[in-house]
Each structure stands twice: as C-alpha cells, then as structure tokens.
Amino acid sequence: MKYALIADIHANLAAFTAVLDDIEHRGGVAELWCLGDIVGYGPDPCRCIELLRQHKHICVAGNHDLAAIGKLPLADFNPDAAIACRWTAQQLSEEDKEYLSNLPTVIERDDFTLVHGSPREPVWEYLVSTGSAGESFGYFKTKFCLVGHSHIPVIFRLSEDGSCSYAALRENIGQVLGKSRMIINPGGIGQPRDGDPRASYAIYDSESHVVRLYRIPYDINATQVEMTKHNLPMRLVVRLEQGL
C-alpha cells in the first residue's frame, strides 16, 4: 500500500491541487496522512479543508488549525501570522470549525506516530536540530514518527549508540526505512522554507518500506494574487516565491 505524507497545506489551494494531481499521476495512494496546518497564511482555507475531506485521509491538528478556531491564543503568533489567523477564522464555516476542532494532536498508525510539531510537544515544538530531535525519540513508542511544522524535508535517525543524525530528504531519492528509529518530515506544501518554492510531499510504500520525496511546481502567482486580494500581509505573499 502507498500513503501520501503531506503537511502544512496552509490554505494554498494551487499548491495542494498540484500535489493531489501529482499523486494521481503516480497511480494514487490508499490514504493521505496529513500532519496538520491545513489553514493559516494562505487565501483558501475553506476550499483546502473541503478538498482534503474529499479524499480518504487521517489528519492531526496543527497550531494554525487550532488558532483559527480559538483553541490557541494569537499572542503566541508573530504579527503577520496572527493577522492571517484572524482573517482565516472569519472565513470558516461552522462545519469547517467542527472538523478542525475534532482533529486529534497525535495519531498512531501501524509503525508510525503522526504529530504536527514533535512527539514531545505535538502542536508547537519545531524539530530543526539533532539535539531537540534526539530528545524526542523518548516521547513516542512506534518505530517511526512523522512531523511537519518546520516546512523542511528532513530525516532524523537514532543510532544504536543513542546519537541522533540529520539528513535532508532529497527529491526523488528513495529513503529505506530500516532498523533504525526515525523522525521524518516531508516538507511543506503551501509554504516551503528550505529555499525551494515548489510544494513538497512524500509517498511511503509499505511493501518496499521506502519513503520518496517529490517537489511539485505550482502557480505561485495565482496564490499571491488571491492573498493580495484579501489584504493578507505582504511578507507572507513574497515569501512564497522565495521558498522561505
């Protein structure tokens, strides 16, 4: 079976649609595994929620998902993110809010634990160093953990001696999930932050035990036009073309 590992859609409909089209082009998957932040930053929160719900999927809550329904204080967000969260909250239907409200913060599926931030702090913690990642291995019981939040495609591997190593997930290069425990981030769909503006996602093949990353170009300008139309912060508009 194949599963799409997706994260940080961030209300970017053009990017999400491009990723879903690519998944279908590759033969489809059994299920989407979404690592949170469906909404926030981008201009199409309702349509992205609707599109995700049209597919068989599991999903954990991200910090932007919770902030948009009043479950996290906006004081914890930077000013531009807070502005986008307030705007997002005004767009959501009651059905959208109920869907986001019912998202769990942790899901266990087979050998995987799914969280948005980290297994230690599922909503907020960023895993961007071997130090924080190494400490996180003690907070989940499965062999592997899938995370989002940083928008950077990466694998953290726990060695037999207890040390933690870091490796970037490279485009179209399969990563075999072997004996070592790993924390895997498939990168961000709606707002990549590794210097590559293309949408990022991965497919996991449960028969070959391989995770493969894909980078998908999309119409960035179309998203920027919609963001500008809704008076979302210009810094958020510009960063899409920079991949930062």
What would you call each of these model-derived segments?
Residues M1-A4, E108-L114, L177-M182:
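Beta-strand-turn-beta hairpins that frame and shape the catalytic cleft
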Residues M1-H57:
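N-terminal active-site segment of His-dependent metallophosphoesterases
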Residues I6-A7, L32-G36, I58-N63, V115, ...:
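Active-site neighborhood of phospho(di)ester-bond hydrolases with catalytic His/Asp-centered motifs
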Residues H10-A15, G40-G42, H64-I69, R120-P122, ...:
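Active-site environment of divalent metal-dependent phosphoester hydrolases
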Residues C48-I49, Q54-K141:
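Active-site neighborhood of divalent metal-dependent phosphoester bond hydrolases
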Residues V106-E108, P153-R157, S200-Y204:
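Short beta-strand scaffold segments in enzyme catalytic cores
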Residues T130-G174, K179-I183:
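Anionic-ligand binding region
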Residues E160-L244:
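Acidic, His/Gly-rich catalytic cores of divalent-metal-dependent hydrolytic chemistry
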